Swiss-Prot record:
Keyword annotations from UniProtKB, A to Z: Cytoplasm, Hydrolase, RNA-binding, tRNA-binding
Subunit (UniProt): Homodimer.
Keyword tRNA-binding included in the entry's annotation: yes
Organism annotation: Listeria welshimeri serovar 6b (strain ATCC 35897 / DSM 20650 / CCUG 15529 / CIP 8149 / NCTC 11857 / SLCC 5334 / V8)
Listed EC numbers: 3.1.1.96
Main location (coarse class): cytoplasm
UniProt-recorded name of the protein: D-aminoacyl-tRNA deacylase
Record remark: domains: A Gly-cisPro motif from one monomer fits into the active site of the other monomer to allow specific chiral rejection of L-amino acids.
Motif (Gly-cisPro motif, important for rejection of L-amino acids): 137-138
Catalyzed chemical reaction(s): glycyl-tRNA(Ala) + H2O = tRNA(Ala) + glycine + H(+); a D-aminoacyl-tRNA + H2O = a tRNA + a D-alpha-amino acid + H(+)
Extent of the signal sequence: none
GO process annotations (BP): D-amino acid catabolic process
GO CC, one annotated term: cytoplasm
EC class: hydrolase
Amino acid sequence: MRVLLQRCYEASVSVEEEVISEIAGGLCLLVGFTHDDTPETVEYMAKKVVGLRIFEDESEKMNISLAERGGAILSVSQFTLYADVSKGKRPSFTKSAPGEKAERLYDLFNTKLSEAGFIVETGVFGAFMDVKIINHGPITMMLDSAEMRK
């Protein structure tokens, strides 16, 4: 599982030029799944996201988590996080989880974030979406469950 996490002032997602979800501040997450991801992977990553200390304290050090600071989450499914561009010029997506499995895990991930007490707005799984983000910092981090659980 990969999560591209961006700290943001605001973020929104539109489908067919209509805004369907938006947040006023917090985290924008682009979320992708691979074949061996499990519900346990999802739970681990949800805890990691809400516990990361990526907001500044009074000393301007990244020392405060979203759980401590408060804020909302915009979660957007993003199968292209598992694009393989090692051969040729066209990306391959064979490392991405099949749609049905990915959707199930994506829904579970958003449920876990909600259960942790956050307002979670989402995109539409499988839809072509426009995502607008006003990045704060900018702070952008790639979380990869395979790398973090070695």
